[in-house]
Amino acid sequence: GLVLAGPVGVKFSGVTERDILDMHSMPRPAFLAKAWADPAQAEPDYTAMSDTELAGVARGRESLALFGWKPYMHDPRLRRWLHRIDVPTKLLWGEQDGVVSADYCRNWCGEIAGATLETIPNAGHYPQWEQPDAFAAKVAAFAATLS
């Protein structure tokens, strides 16, 4: 089976409409307020990180800019391949996700045969970090249906 958490990468709406929040058009605190149900959980203590850990953070942001800049956060070719996914698929969406909407996730379900969507309360775009127990329970329940 396949589990997708607040997926991005596909353009469903028209050319001038945003499917995915433009994180680069706002100050970081504003983005964090949209992405997290509790923005206080969002940022680690960078001053406590080792140089290796900080380099990892920088590499992650560099990769995001490289792969998500243009076209913004999607691959124009991806949507045409979604119908080929032929394994049971569960989409998980944080109820307070301001990065992608529930409708955006429902569009994914419409492209993947049999895919279903579940929400996780008190979570934003990163339910696996904000509500790890609820996230793990939903993944485990889904996995149990695969046997």
Language-model segments: what does each one mean?
Residues 1-30:
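Flexible "cap/lid" loop of the alpha/beta hydrolase fold
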Residues 3, 90-92, 118:
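Hydrophobic/aromatic beta-strand patches that form the interior of the parallel beta-sheet core
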Residues 13-18, 103-105, 130-132:
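Short aromatic-enriched loop/helix-cap "lid" or pocket-rim segments at secondary-structure transitions
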Residues 51-80:
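Hydrophobic, aromatic-rich cap/lid helix
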Residues 70-73, 97-100, 124-127:
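Glycosyltransferase donor-binding loop in the core domain
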Residues 78, 87, 101-110:
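Short alpha-helix in the alpha/beta-hydrolase fold that links the catalytic acid
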Residues 85, 91-93, 97:
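Short beta-strand/loop motif that positions the catalytic acidic residue
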Residues 114-147:
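Catalytic active-site module of serine/aspartate enzymes centered on a nucleophile-bearing elbow/loop
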